[in-house]
Amino acid sequence: MEKELTNNHNPFKHVYTGVDKTVKRAIPLKAIKKIKNLDLSLHPSLDFARDMFLFSFYTRGMSFIDMAHLKKKDLQNGILSYRRRKTGQQLFIKWEKCMQEIADKHKTDYDSPYLLPILKYPYDNRSQYRNALYRTNKNLKEVAKLAGISIPLTLYVARHSWASIAKSKNIPISVISEGMGHDSEMTTQIYLASLDNSVVDGANIQILRV
């Protein structure tokens, strides 16, 4: 019995002991600016990945799957409207110059219904999306290295960063919740709590000084 326990270093390895928690990472505004200011003109694949990251950030953390399915007709009279595929919630975003610059830089074919060149064919959208997501996240790792960012950069970091920066600027939870398309403010509170450990870290420092 003792031998069995000794060999099994983690007896709870296959036991579910709680609710899964996704690790969420955010970067500060100064890191976003570093990414934006990179000269990637000689690296078109990295340039595209960087611009998709920025587009997500500019559009209040729009998820990549929603970006992929944006249609040209979704942009009318200076307002971009789309329905979140995750929740079905309809969102409206004021179209800004920074968004237009990315759309102009990465124009789709004239006869393409899509606003961004993520889905390029009218068939097998799921496979196209998965491949584009993989390539973009892979290239973002290289972008992060060039920008001197230590955390693994992914498209979701853009969403997490928008929420974190909004919170740091004392934007009300209700506004952040609406901006991100959450179904409740409670969801946003949980989301933000998982992003920011600075308050807890600060409390721990005070305790350790006692």
What feature does the model see in each segment?
Residues 7, 13-14, 69-105:
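Conserved tyrosine-mediated DNA breakage-rejoining catalytic core shared by Y-recombinases
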Residues 18, 84-88, 180-205:
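Catalytic-site neighborhood detector that most strongly recognizes the C-terminal catalytic loop/helix
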Residues 26-33, 96-150:
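Active-site/catalytic core of tyrosine-dependent DNA strand-transfer enzymes
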Residues 40-44, 81-94, 123-132, 151-157:
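Short, contiguous acidic/charged loop-to-helix segments that flank catalytic cores in large enzymes
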Residues 4-64:
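Basic, Lys/Arg- and aromatic-enriched nucleic-acid-binding interface segment
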Residues 37-44, 109, 137-178:
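Short, basic (Lys/Arg/His-rich) helix/loop patches that form interaction surfaces
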Residues 73-81, 149-151, 171-190:
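Short, polar N-cap/turn motifs at the start of nucleic acid-interacting alpha helices
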Residues 92-97, 101, 105-106, 193-210:
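DNA/chromatin major-groove-contacting recognition/catalytic segments
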